[in-house]
UniProtKB/Swiss-Prot annotation:
GO molecular function, one term: leucyl-tRNA--protein transferase activity
GO biological process: protein catabolic process
A Gene Ontology cellular-component term: cytoplasm
Gene: aat
Catalytic reactions of this protein: N-terminal L-lysyl-[protein] + L-leucyl-tRNA(Leu) = N-terminal L-leucyl-L-lysyl-[protein] + tRNA(Leu) + H(+); N-terminal L-arginyl-[protein] + L-leucyl-tRNA(Leu) = N-terminal L-leucyl-L-arginyl-[protein] + tRNA(Leu) + H(+); L-phenylalanyl-tRNA(Phe) + an N-terminal L-alpha-aminoacyl-[protein] = an N-terminal L-phenylalanyl-L-alpha-aminoacyl-[protein] + tRNA(Phe)
Family according to the record: Belongs to the L/F-transferase family.
Species of the source: Shewanella piezotolerans (strain WP3 / JCM 13877)
Protein task: Functions in the N-end rule pathway of protein degradation where it conjugates Leu, Phe and, less efficiently, Met from aminoacyl-tRNAs to the N-termini of proteins containing an N-terminal arginine or lysine.
Name by which UniProt lists this protein: Leucyl/phenylalanyl-tRNA--protein transferase
Record's signal peptide: none
Length: 236
């Protein structure tokens, strides 16, 4: 039987993801901190933090894992028709702080957000170091949606998305996967399956298969200009 590991401030390494609990699914370790080195080590090994505001830091590696292959996003005809009617524009890394704040904002039927001030600061640090990135959706000069995540080699680890207009987060996802495909990325890690991701074509794969893919792709090369701040198109 697997047991939960407890991390201290000086312990940068994680136990193998295969040692994660089955209930709750994927819980691997407790404790540690959110310093950039630890976070990068976690994602490099298929582990991510997820915890509520007043909880200790919890580290996860669930089985199965939700993933996308760039280019395999499921886009319905009705969504394409809807998006063609909009005059939205899209950008990369133009307003990362605003995107993560948008993702952290309370949502309907949700009493609290897991994206605490500490989480926001941690990922802002990763963004400043060139590891965390955002996609923005604009209506004129108003930010109406977006998403953020981390780039680990040829893998993009999606963290969260938000929308203030119908389908704006889906538009951000379309822009992201088209951009990743152009830049040489091979996999989008969506972490935990849910109906929204399933509707977009996410696939659930066994953790061992995900870890095999990750080990193959995490040191791979992509376009070095992938994350320059710029406007990007959407192809419908």
């Amino acid at each position: 039987m697997n047991s939960l590991s407890y991390l201290n401030q000086d312990q940068q390494s994680f136990p193998p993801p295969e040692q994660a609990l089955s209930d709750p699914n994927g819980l691997l370790a407790v404790g540690g901190d959110l310093q950039p080195e630890r976070l990068l080590n976690a994602y490099y090994n298929g582990i991510f933090p997820w915890f509520n505001q007043d909880d200790p830091i919890l580290w996860w590696s669930p089985d199965p894992r939700a993933v996308f292959a760039p280019g395999n996003l499921r886009v319905s005809r009705s969504l394409i028709k809807y998006l063609k009617k909009q005059s939205w524009t899209f950008s990369i890394n133009k307003q990362f702080p605003a995107v993560i704040r948008g993702c952290a904002a309370p949502r309907a039927k949700q009493e609290e957000t897991w994206i605490s001030d500490d989480i926001q600061q941690a990922y802002l640090s990763l963004h400043q170091q060139g590891h965390a990135h955002s996609i923005e959706v604009w209506e004129d000069d108003i930010l109406i949606g977006g998403l953020y995540g981390l780039a680990i080699g040829q893998v993009f680890c999606g963290e969260s998305m938000f929308h203030l207009r119908t389908n704006a987060s889906k538009a951000a996802m379309i822009v992201l996967q088209q951009h990743l495909l152009r830049c040489g990325f091979k996999l989008i890690d969506a972490q935990v399956e849910n109906p929204h991701l399933d509707s977009l074509g996410a696939k659930s794969i066994k953790r061992k298969d995900f870890l095999t893919l990750l080990k193959h792709l995490r040191d791979g090369d992509v376009n070095p200009d992938s994350w320059l701040t710029t406007e990007v198109p959407i192809e419908l």
